[in-house]
A protein has these predicted regions:
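Conserved, well-structured ligand/cofactor-binding cores
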Residues: 1-150
C-alpha cells in the first residue's frame, strides 16, 4: 500500500519501474509468507525435530519484505522532493508505513531465526530504515515550510 500511495504525489505520471517491481514482489511475498509458515507449522505438529530449512524459509519472506521496504524508503526521496505538494500527506503516510513495516517484521523474523541460531542484524536494518525515514521526513517538513511562505 505504501509503495503505491506515494504515486499520488508524482507530477509526471510516469512509470516507476522500481516501484512497480517492489509492489509486484510484495504481492508474491504475501502468499510465500503464508505457505512457508504453514509448512513450518505442519512439520512442527509431527512432533519431530524440525529441519532448520523450514525456519529459514519461514523467515525469508519477512526478510525480503524488510529489504524491499528499505529500498522503497530510499527510492521515494525524489518523489517527496519533486512531487505534488498538494498530495504531500500521501508521502507522509507512505514514509511512515514503510518504516513501520520494517519494525513490525522483526518479531516474526526473530521467532523464525532464533531456534536455528541464524544471525540477522535487526538493529542495523531498523537504524538504516530510520535514517531514510528521517531524511524523507526532513524533505517533507522543508516542503511544508516552503508552502507556508507562498
Amino acid at each position: 500500500m505504501a509503495v503505491n500511495i506515494v504515486r499520488m504525489m508524482d507530477r509526471r505520471n510516469v512509470s516507476h519501474e522500481t516501484l512497480d517491481n517492489i509492489s509486484d514482489r510484495l504481492v508474491d511475498l504475501i502468499q510465500e509468507d503464508v505457505d512457508y509458515a504453514n509448512a513450518l507449522v505442519k512439520e512442527y505438529k509431527k512432533g519431530k525435530i524440525v529441519d532448520d530449512e523450514y525456519f529459514l524459509k519461514a523467515a525469508r519472506p519477512q526478510m525480503e519484505l524488510v529489504e524491499l521496504s528499505i529500498k522503497a524508503l530510499d527510492y521515494i526521496e525524489s518523489i517527496l522532493e519533486n512531487g505534488k505538494l498538494d498530495a504531500i500527506s500521501d508521502g507522509i503516510i507512505a514514509n511512515n508505513l514503510l518504516l513501520e513495516v520494517v519494525r513490525d517484521a522483526m518479531p516474526t523474523i526473530r521467532v523464525n531465526l532464533d531456534p536455528i541460531s541464524k544471525s540477522y542484524d535487526y538493529d542495523e536494518k531498523i537504524d538504516y530504515a530510520k535514517k531514510l525515514h528521517n531524511r524523507n521526513q526532513q524533505i517533507i517538513e522543508r516542503r511544508l515550510k516552503w508552502q507556508e511562505y507562498m
